[in-house]
């Protein structure tokens, strides 16, 4: 029996390094950043949720359910993940940021295979050098653990998953897969990469 997998795209942050611009809606080569992300993951999952804490109406125009953090105060990616885990009945939830337009087109199958091979609770992607703490495939049943962690004042995703049986899946074969946009300069470089 195949596993049902939903996804959440995290677009709930403050984007301080982008001058406060909503990163998911910043245009890259004529399309909103989040549209590139959607195009990459849509064939790999059943449902997509968009986690946004502002500009919800604009995000809804992409045709997917928009959810805002249950925990108020822009508490970071964990808050968005907790909210999404409470909104899905899938076996696994894929978590990705809104500003990674070159995500692997084989992200889900490889991460799922890694989980099953190790009988792990979650998989975290790596670029071959660094783990990508907001590119995860996890079981929604981990929600209570994550909620308790956040409510204890913790914010770091990697500190949370270190407490669980996790596996790292390397995408070193796709070196630009997790290049993201935090500054206008990075956006310019990425635009050139996409047009190659």
From Swiss-Prot:
It is found in: Cytoplasm. This is Molybdenum cofactor guanylyltransferase. It catalyses: Mo-molybdopterin + GTP + H(+) = Mo-molybdopterin guanine dinucleotide + diphosphate. It holds the Pfam family NTP_transf_3. Its cofactor is Mg(2+). The gene is mobA. The keyword Magnesium applies. One of its GO terms (molecular function) is GTP binding. The keyword GTP-binding applies. One of its GO terms (biological process) is bis(molybdopterin guanine dinucleotide)molybdenum biosynthetic process. Its main location: cytoplasm.
């Amino acid at each position: 029996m195949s596993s049902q997998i939903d996804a959440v795209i995290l677009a709930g942050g403050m984007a301080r390094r982008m001058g406060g611009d909503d990163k998911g809606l910043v245009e890259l080569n004529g399309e909103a950043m989040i549209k590139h992300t959607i195009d990459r993951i849509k064939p790999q999952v059943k449902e997509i949720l968009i986690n946004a804490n502002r500009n919800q109406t604009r995000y809804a125009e992409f045709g997917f359910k928009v959810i805002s953090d249950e925990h108020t105060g822009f508490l970071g990616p964990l808050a968005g993940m907790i909210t999404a885990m409470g909104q899905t009945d899938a076996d696994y939830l894929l978590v990705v940021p809104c500003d990674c337009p070159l995500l692997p087109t084989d992200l889900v199958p490889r991460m799922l295979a890694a989980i099953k091979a190790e009988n792990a609770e979650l998989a975290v992607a790596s670029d071959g050098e660094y783990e990508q703490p907001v590119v995860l495939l996890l079981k929604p049943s981990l929600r209570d653990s994550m909620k308790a962690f956040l409510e204890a004042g913790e914010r770091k995703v990697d500190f949370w998953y270190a407490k669980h049986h996790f596996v790292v899946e390397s995408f070193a074969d796709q070196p630009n897969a997790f290049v993201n946009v935090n500054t206008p300069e990075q956006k310019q470089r990425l635009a050139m990469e996409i047009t190659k």
